[in-house]
């Protein structure tokens, strides 16, 4: 099993897709990359803690290759916008990848190179060593499954799920 910590805007979006990905055993929404110990959602959303909203995706690389997890990441958000994903604006929504080993860092850099071929603007995804990971509050875990009819889910997450189904259907469970 392997775990990647990835930030691509609001963690609810990545969580929704990776929850439906074959070989993924766990998706934990959380915060990392900031300077406040044990931040909460409201502190992170204030933009003053330095944290990014992220998901820790644990998967079996014999079922779903690392490259698929990473390529999906770049397909599900715009890695060319600094500190913004759609209407979500602030450093907490930055495109980011947090590694724990040199091998992960290399994988992340290779994924950025692959993704750059798909984007006309430069990719601004931050690649950093993983500092402390703070698990988000329970309400944010598997958010889409809990609140599929909530406005944000309908307007923002549903199109991302549709895109994932279009391009990664072989890797999705439903």
Curated annotation (Swiss-Prot):
<dbReference type="InterPro" id="IPR036509">
    <property type="entry name" value="Met_Sox_Rdtase_MsrA_sf"/>
</dbReference>
<dbReference type="GO" id="GO:0036211">
    <property type="term" value="P:protein modification process"/>
</dbReference>
<dbReference type="GO" id="GO:0008113">
    <property type="term" value="F:peptide-methionine (S)-S-oxide reductase activity"/>
</dbReference>
<dbReference type="GO" id="GO:0033744">
    <property type="term" value="F:L-methionine:thioredoxin-disulfide S-oxidoreductase activity"/>
</dbReference>
<comment type="similarity">
    <text>Belongs to the MsrA Met sulfoxide reductase family.</text>
</comment>
<comment type="function">
    <text>Has an important function as a repair enzyme for proteins that have been inactivated by oxidation. Catalyzes the reversible oxidation-reduction of methionine sulfoxide in proteins to methionine.</text>
</comment>
<dbReference type="Pfam" id="PF01625">
    <property type="entry name" value="PMSR"/>
</dbReference>
<protein>
    <recommendedName>
        <fullName>Peptide methionine sulfoxide reductase MsrA</fullName>
        <ecNumber>1.8.4.11</ecNumber>
    </recommendedName>
</protein>
<keyword id="KW-0560">Oxidoreductase</keyword>
<feature type="active site">
    <location>
        <position position="10"/>
    </location>
</feature>
<dbReference type="InterPro" id="IPR002569">
    <property type="entry name" value="Met_Sox_Rdtase_MsrA_dom"/>
</dbReference>
